[in-house]
């Protein structure tokens, strides 16, 4: 966004746990590379991009004063988190005086309260918060947890009102496969860079970030103008359903059909003359018919999913997907089967075949 819009911002990284990688990041002058690998409109891509927007990285367990001083910066506006599914949780043992609180929501509440006091409740100094943890309606969960800390720590009605009216905590859905550090490719990457980057992050080309927030927020966070696949929508739920139905659902039925046909890699299954036709039929003729989103959006998403399945850099074994296939089918495919039957008056043969293969 800095390169393609007038966003003109920097990032401070705060690690959520005691032991993290901020020392390594600071040792590299807060620079690292992202290695994107995959297919983009049928073309193979293997790119390296330097990330240079981080101004510094903090460990709140050893630099708590510096962490809290972030709240004193008037231009601070966005908080974006990814602390894993376990990160958004209420820990009643946390205290306001802890330096810092052990839980992420506790740390965030401390930061918000310090900002509230620093600016005497000025509503123009509220923060926009985007949690990216893989929890359905993660923003709702984080907001509820902050309210629990406001109650536990008796922070008062004035702060609670400021948080409600000046701050926004928005649910998001993120979708991108990020294998992380490219151990098998790092020697070639360092040779290409001509220096050591020990924090290279490998990821697929595809990316999606759905944010349940009003369009006014999109104006402040102009990701769409930067050409990024970031959607500001009234409700995250249809996009969550789309991902489960058109990404996870096909995986669940494709894998046993491929395995019984002697094919062991997802990419090879998609390129198989028979299995490839099968999964296309399941996605475009069956599962897509059960969703209530614009058809062009669904078609584009399904095409992107197939490109991801065909990623030449990822050998995704079908046996790893087949673990717990029955409960996976129940949550990912059975709802679509029922909806298809209700709407069409007949069973979707591809989904039935997948169930039989399981």
Q: Across the structure, where does each feature detected by a protein language model lie?
A:
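Substrate/ligand-engaging "lid" and interaction regions
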Residues: 2-358
